[in-house]
């Protein structure tokens, strides 16, 4: 059974990667602008003063304009840094320098605060390949965010950022997979 779920996840991830790859630039730009508006709305609605997010890659729903807005508003933004042991360190982002980690993921160059720094935020924005209508999140397969969220004693609201067609009825899941409290898509905010 675990192999069957793993195969289902692999197939779905491949399909989603291909869909993202062939999305026309003008569609992506419009989606990113709408996502930024909705992330700002969510942050304002929750009165967030400190959040954890991630720097989106070119094929992901865009978070960079939102992060720039948050920094400009004086909201503390922590960004992840992947570690070889499967955990995430966190570092504050000031909108300036960034580099790339060993997995090709963008990361801030500021002081590394360690894995428990995320416990100080009041909102967490995570990437996802897909999320189902019960809030089950399927990531890209490395398990970093599942480990982080699963280890938090008092987890603040967690929202995944996805494209509209990535909110589905069900996603294949395993015991370690973590649910999110909602999603932000180009069409809006959906809470579960």
Task: Outline where the language-model segments fall.
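Surface-exposed, charge/polar-rich loops and edge strands
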Residues: 1-7, 11, 18-25, 109-110, ...
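N-terminal active-site beta-alpha-beta segment that forms phosphate/nucleotide-binding
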Residues: 1-120
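Short, charged low-complexity linear motifs
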Residues: 35, 126-131
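Glycine-rich, N-terminal phosphate-binding loop of Rossmann-like dinucleotide-binding domains
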Residues: 55, 128, 187
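Short glycine-rich anion-binding loops that position phosphate/pyrophosphate groups of nucleotides
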Residues: 57-59, 129-133
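Short capping loops/turns at secondary-structure boundaries
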Residues: 114, 137-138
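Short polar/charged helix/loop
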Residues: 141
